Each structure stands twice: as C-alpha cells, then as structure tokens.
Amino acid sequence: HSSNRRQRQMCIRDSFIKALYATFVTYLPKEEFSYDLISHQDDRGIFVEFLKSKLFGQVSFLTSNPGVTRGEHFHNTKLEKFLVIKGEARFKFRSLDNNEKFEIYTNHKKLQVVESIPGWAHDITNVGESEMIVLLWANEIFDEKKPDTFSHEV
C-alpha cells in the first residue's frame, strides 16, 4: 500500500517480491512519486528517518551544530553505523563492563564508518566550525514502545 510507503517501511526480501513491488509502483499516480519526511528538530540540529525495513533496519540522517553533542546512550541489541558526510566529528565510547573509554575522530574527507556496539555507551560531537551531517544505519527500526536506547554518561 502507499500507506506503507509513507511510513517508510520496505519489504523486498526476494526476487519475486522485488518484481511485484516494482510492478505495483508503476501504477502509482504522479502525486505519489514523492512524499515528505518528518524532521525532528531542536537546538542541536535535526534528525530524519529516511528508510525503514524489518529486514535491513533503518537509515536516517542527522545534523549537528558546532560544539553540539548527541547520543550519550547505549543499546542492548541495536547496532549503528555512522558516516560523516559533512563536517568533523568526535565519537566517544565507554564500556558498560569495565568503564574503558576511547575516542575516534573523523571527518567527511576520510569516508570512515564508525560503529556503535551494544554494551558501549556512545556519543558524537561536532568538533568542526560548521554544520555536521551524518548518515546513520541501524540494524533495527526504532520502536517507541521498546526503544533499546538508554541514557548513559560517556
């Protein structure tokens, strides 16, 4: 249904379903060739969920203003992969097991993927002088009823 498209959930798990979906979208009216996304905006920047699938997880992006830190949480099962596509970032990590800490600095010139691992609290800080834009993949869709995101000092 087009309502699933608006919820940004995709289910293309095999070649038959892929072909069926491709056929379905060829019948969409022109008015449904595009749709708006919801932007969650505050003084830190914006966060936008782009694609969701129970099979491949979720793709989102965020922006952060200079000096802003986002995150400061951990997950039990959620894996995340971050790619800075504009700006400079510092990722901080703290092990929940032994309090070990470390940092990773990266920027858009490196094209380096930084992963958050379950059991490690993490945050990301814009250490540059301009807006930072980060592409984010998570292995599971955010579920407001079971968020698997727990605030924790890094």
What are these model-derived regions, one by one?
Residues 56, 68-81, 108-110:
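A short beta-loop-beta micro-motif enriched in histidine and acidic residues
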Residues 1-12:
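Single conserved hydrophobic/aromatic residue that forms the stacking wall/gate
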Residues 47, 71-73, 91-93, 114-116, ...:
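Short beta-strand His + acidic residue motifs that chelate non-heme Fe in jelly-roll/DSBH
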Residues 97-100, 125-154:
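Double-stranded beta-helix
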Residues 33-72:
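A short glycine-rich, His/Asp/Glu-containing loop-to-beta-strand
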Residues 13-22, 26-29:
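Anionic-ligand-binding alpha/beta catalytic cores of soluble enzymes and soluble regulatory domains
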Residues 96-118:
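Short acidic-glycine-tyrosine-enriched beta hairpin
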Residues 77-95:
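Glycine- and acidic-residue-biased ligand/ion/polar-headgroup-sensing regions
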